[in-house]
Regions:
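Solvent-exposed hydroxyl-ligand-binding patches built from regularly spaced Ser/Thr
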Residues: 44-421
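N-terminal secretory signal peptides
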Residues: 1-38
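Short, conserved catalytic or interaction motifs in soluble domains
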Residues: 41
Length: 421
């Protein structure tokens, strides 16, 4: 049996009174406030420019993806350093996150760009996780997985654990409340984690996934095994429909034991509300809906790849769940792709991180850089200096990977240290 096509908010969807057209659905999306978030899409607050107005327009650039470096901020392992010193930095509710961004977090970054689309200083950065809730059952140490509200989460080599989980995977236990950043694979329905943080008494839970068993009369639907009631949702930015990728905020109260147990939704949004044209747009993620190799979506963002150049593969390789990096421009809510690069999941599972800054708290085996603990040793390579130049205050560039073992993901193992002037 062919796998069900997942929908984006630009596909035909059902309203309470019947069907609405693709055109009307697009107008609904474009009429919404610009809501952007990280690796797996997600709702958000209005993106504000550095001057306080709405950032955007055809001369601005937008990059959506994972934080892979600091000094200033680096996304998706591309090595481009974006100056965040004057940017507004917040979560998707507008709460200030300055000084609280972490490696592995999923973000949307708006920058200025010239006619060629070359980014300069960031105007705004919005971070948002894909899942927040209580761990159910015992985490599976053999498979490196755990379950939150029916959603299976996979921990990989590049998963970063916040210091609130000091023993990495071993810190996870039944009933621990966590926020997870990552990418949902539309083919396997597994959320591959890029960052995990422990939460204490959060005001709400949240989940992102594909709608199934939608009942417009009772205003209920499923995401995976959980039943969601949105009858009293105070913010409903789209009409739920089977196959649609949605982001739902839930009350942080466990459903009653009596079946069918229902989670109560307070907000339902699409993964991306793209209200402004962008001269340059870049997104890394999984294919979440597929019509053809020329028309698909990435993390809920519709992509027209009819004239794109494909790298590290061909157009025939595009399928549901495949990881890609897409570059182009955003026109009327559609990403007009100029380049589509197919990505290897295994490579990304061991992705390299990059840090720039001043060495602090130096010991014989570790130091701190940009708030991150870095391990170094005999296997570390050096450029423009040697280990004797590694002193507190030294300006360095570090490239490395998340370490393995207890507390591994809270540290970076340096594979190369370069001394900077």
């Amino acid at each position: 049996m062919a796998k069900e096509k997942h929908l984006t908010s630009l596909d035909f969807t059902a309203s309470h009174s019947g069907s609405i057209t693709r055109r009307n659905s697009m107008l609904t999306v474009l009429g919404s406030a610009l809501a952007l978030a990280g690796c797996g899409g997600g709702g958000g607050a209005v993106v504000a420019g550095a001057g306080g107005g709405a950032a955007g327009g055809a001369t601005s650039a937008l990059t959506v993806g994972q934080i892979t470096g600091f000094g200033s901020i680096i996304l998706n392992g591309n090595g481009v350093r974006i100056d965040d010193s004057s940017a507004s930095i917040s979560d998707d509710d507008g709460n200030d996150l300055r000084g609280r961004l972490r490696l592995g977090m999923c973000v949307a970054v708006v920058t200025a760009s010239n006619g060629a689309g070359n980014s300069v200083a960031a105007q705004s950065i919005i971070s948002s996780g894909e899942l927040q809730g209580r761990i159910v059952g015992t985490p599976n140490t053999a498979q490196n997985t755990f379950v939150v509200m029916g959603q299976t989460v996979k921990v990989v080599g590049a998963t970063v654990f916040d210091t609130s989980l000091p023993n990495g995977f071993a810190s996870l236990a039944t009933d621990t409340i966590v926020e997870v950043h990552g990418q949902l694979n539309a083919n396997t329905n597994v959320l591959k984690a890029s960052f995990i943080e422990k939460k204490t008494a959060p005001a709400f839970f949240k989940i992102q996934g594909f709608v199934s068993n939608h009942n417009a009369s009772t205003r209920k639907f499923n995401i995976g095994p959980i039943l969601i009631n949105y009858a009293n949702a105070t913010e409903l930015r789209l009409t739920p429909a089977n196959g649609l990728l949605v982001r739902v905020r839930l009350t942080a109260v466990l459903p009653p034991l009596a079946l069918p147990a229902e989670w109560l939704a307070t907000r339902v949004r699409g993964p991306e509300h793209l209200a402004e044209n962008r001269g340059a747009f870049e997104i890394e993620g999984g294919v979440t809906s597929f019509t053809s190799s020329a028309l698909f979506s990435v993390n809920g963002v519709p992509v027209d790849a009819s004239t794109a150049v494909f790298e590290r593969g061909t157009a025939a390789s595009i399928a549901l769940g495949v990881r890609v990096e897409v570059k182009g421009s955003l026109v009327n809510g559609m990403l007009i792709a100029t380049r589509v690069k197919l990505e290897d999941d295994n490579e990304l599972d061991e992705r390299e991180f990059e840090l720039h800054g001043s060495v602090a708290n130096l010991t014989a085996t570790t130091f701190t850089l940009r708030g991150v603990t870095v391990e170094y040793g005999a296997a570390t390579l050096y450029r423009r200096g040697t280990v004797t130049n590694l002193v507190n205050g030294a300006q360095v560039e570090v490239k490395g990977v998340a370490t393995t073992g207890t507390g591994a993901a809270t540290r970076i193992l340096a594979t190369r240290i370069s001394f900077e002037s």
